[in-house]
């Protein structure tokens, strides 16, 4: 639905906005398309710009942290945490990429990143996991 020119300009504007914080294409080359929707064309455009297309690993429900109680697909933070831990118990999480949103609707009062993320990190560390930068995980 977008042209290559629009796509490239949008990416470049994003990096310009992030530059004051030291974030550059060189040190943060990862691209997760909005809503995780992409096709071969978007993948090729991203690759030609030096971007590495990534997506979260399905099955943990981590990405549901944006949902609100009024949505049919709503998942509470307790439910998300339990789903992740159950996935870890049944299959393990080595190599999994989880998506947590940095901000959510005011309608969602149990924000995973403020109420459960710390607990998840501590629990996974206790279970022997270590967290590494994405650059080390996929290269």
Model-derived features: positions:
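Catalytic domains of cell-wall/extracellular-matrix polysaccharide-remodeling enzymes
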Residues: 1-99, 103-125, 129-130, 135-139
